[in-house]
């Protein structure tokens, strides 16, 4: 990947001037100027996903300049470098090949001259066999009973992705009950263990190194709980599986290495649900549906790699995001799925985006001080958010671009629930774009029989300025295939932005310092002696904790 400061490109400088030219033009005026705006500013994927980006503060010149920016930042070359297994994660000297995990075409993908696809396919075959045995009931626990509950123990990418997907695809779940434990707070594992029976529970310990503090602390507690009932360490093999690469530590734990599912250092944690880390997904929805999840992502990979920039959905979304955060001053993006099954979608991409692009050092090692990198990502399902934080989006002083996501078809046809849900989905983007003028507010009052003199003091509070940017993503139905495509779409959006930001999107050194300090503090919490080895605030907090515990 080349080292190109985006602010030094011709396109960036042109965009700065273009922003000034467009500053006084509202979204409403853009619609008036362009009668075919919806058709001209929307894209479809596989006739199952519609992305409408017409309600943004952009015109064709904006898009043209943004595409020029992508070209000047060598986006196409960077994309090919990723798909071809080059070590684009330079700070860790690793390839970035989550796309190989869902390479349904099975075309060779090389890392260091070796085709990785045979190993990928071998792990998938092993996962399929394991899933069939557990789901069918052939896999028995230590008392001869079939498995009824699966507990996934992981954190970060080993938890957020599998949990998000199993929740999103609950309509496809089988009889197995899934549980996810991530927090090192003992409450998380304790409350989970209250719900399950050691005779019929399977634990998946998801840790590449098998040394992750939070995961192994929870796994050891689960092991103790299990052995208190089983009274035989040899039975661990029937109730624990490992998603790891550390054979020695897995064996030491007592897990049969036949029940160890491998993945590779070219799989980043936040991109790992497509790997063995997705075993909990496959157990929950069946392996055929897991393959459909991979297939949807693979189709989006092909679209991203081959579609012209003008028709390329991930590139378009990424470029609009860069426009919003670097030229319009937005600092956050809200992800608002109008589907209760997608209630963890925003949390998943909060990690995906912020851990990838939350960087202040560019690819040359220089501090970035003249442009913004990754935005803050947040969100909740609609319509809940409407009764919580939409007030600020509509009438606050900050620009908050929003992605509204909804399925046209529901899995639960219940009275007119879905029409009411979707009426809100459509209404919100219309309200955010077009608002309500003073004249419209006054007209409403007059229609209600009020005089303008009576209401003049309340009118300003009921005005909506509009001109708030949104994308509308309408999915025909949330299926394993469309969910896979949606996830891959956002993954590639993040990649594109990282390329243009001139940062390394696939490391996460920002999580390390806190871990190091926690390891230093942990032994200090054991005794009762006063601590004075830190700053006065940290010393004071530790000592108060010791006196209160």
UniProtKB/Swiss-Prot annotation:
One of its GO terms (molecular function) is monosaccharide binding. Its EC number is 5.3.1.9. CDD domains: SIS_PGI_1 (cd05015), SIS_PGI_2 (cd05016). Pathway: Carbohydrate biosynthesis; gluconeogenesis; Carbohydrate degradation; glycolysis; D-glyceraldehyde 3-phosphate and glycerone phosphate from D-glucose: step 2/4. It catalyses: alpha-D-glucose 6-phosphate = beta-D-fructose 6-phosphate. Keywords: Cytoplasm, Gluconeogenesis, Glycolysis, Isomerase. SUPFAM superfamilies: SIS domain. The keyword Isomerase applies. It is found in: Cytoplasm. Belongs to the GPI family. Catalyzes the reversible isomerization of glucose-6-phosphate to fructose-6-phosphate. NCBIfam families: PRK00179.1. PANTHER family: GLUCOSE-6-PHOSPHATE ISOMERASE. This is Glucose-6-phosphate isomerase. It comes from Histophilus somni (strain 2336).
């Amino acid at each position: 990947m080349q080292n190109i400061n985006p602010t030094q490109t011709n396109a960036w400088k042109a965009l700065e001037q273009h922003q000034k030219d467009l500053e006084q033009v509202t979204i409403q005026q853009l619609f008036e100027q362009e009668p075919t705006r919806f058709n001209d500013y929307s894209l479809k994927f596989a006739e199952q996903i519609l992305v409408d980006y017409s309600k943004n503060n952009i015109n064709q010149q904006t898009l043209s300049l943004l595409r020029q920016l992508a070209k000047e930042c060598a986006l196409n070359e960077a994309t090919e470098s990723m798909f071809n297994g080059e070590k684009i994660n330079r700070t860790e000297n690793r390839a970035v090949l989550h796309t190989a995990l869902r390479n349904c075409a099975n075309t060779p993908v090389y890392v260091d001259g070796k085709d990785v696809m045979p190993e990928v396919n071998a792990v998938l075959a092993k996962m399929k066999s394991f899933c069939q045995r557990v789901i069918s009931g052939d896999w028995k626990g230590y008392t001869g009973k079939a498995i009824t509950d699966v507990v996934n123990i992981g954190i970060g990418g080993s938890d957020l992705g599998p949990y998000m997907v199993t929740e999103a695809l609950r309509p496809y779940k089988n009889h197995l009950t899934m549980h996810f434990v991530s927090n090192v707070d003992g409450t998380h594992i304790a409350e989970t263990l209250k719900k399950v029976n050691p005779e019929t529970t399977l634990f998946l310990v998801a840790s590449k190194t098998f040394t992750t503090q939070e995961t192994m602390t929870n796994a050891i507690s689960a092991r103790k709980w299990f052995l208190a009932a089983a009274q035989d360490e040899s039975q661990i093999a029937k109730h624990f599986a490992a998603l790891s690469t550390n054979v020695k530590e897995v064996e030491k734990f007592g897990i049969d290495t036949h029940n160890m599912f491998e993945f590779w250092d070219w799989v980043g944690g936040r991109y790992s649900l497509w790997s063995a880390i997705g075993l909990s997904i496959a157990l929950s929805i069946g392996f055929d549906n897991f393959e459909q999840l991979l297939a949807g992502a693979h189709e989006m990979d092909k679209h991203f790699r081959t579609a012209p920039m003008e028709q390329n959905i991930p590139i378009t979304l990424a470029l609009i995001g860069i426009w919003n955060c670097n030229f319009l001053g937005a600092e956050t993006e809200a992800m608002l799925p109008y589907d209760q099954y997608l209630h963890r979608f925003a949390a998943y991409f909060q990690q995906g985006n912020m851990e990838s692009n939350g960087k202040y050092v560019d690819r040359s090692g220089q501090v970035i001080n003249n442009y913004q990198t990754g935005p803050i990502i947040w969100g909740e399902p609609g319509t809940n958010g409407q009764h919580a934080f939409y007030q600020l989006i509509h009438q606050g002083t900050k620009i908050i671009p929003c992605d509204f996501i909804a399925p046209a078809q529901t899995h639960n046809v219940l009275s007119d629930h879905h029409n009411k849900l979707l009426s809100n989905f459509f209404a919100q983007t219309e309200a955010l774009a077009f608002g309500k003028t003073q004249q419209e507010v006054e007209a409403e009052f007059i229609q209600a029989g009020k005089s303008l003199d009576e209401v003049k003091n309340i009118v300003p509070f009921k005005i909506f300025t509009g001109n708030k940017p949104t994308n509308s993503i309408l999915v025909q139905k949330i299926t394993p295939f469309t969910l896979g495509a949606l996830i891959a779409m956002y993954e590639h959006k993040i990649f594109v932005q990282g390329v243009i930001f001139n940062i390394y999107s696939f490391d996460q050194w920002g999580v390390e310092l806190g871990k190091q300090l926690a390891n230093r503090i942990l032994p200090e919490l054991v005794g009762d002696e006063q601590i004075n080895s830190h700053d006065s605030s940290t010393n004071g907090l530790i000592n108060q904790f010791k006196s209160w515990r």
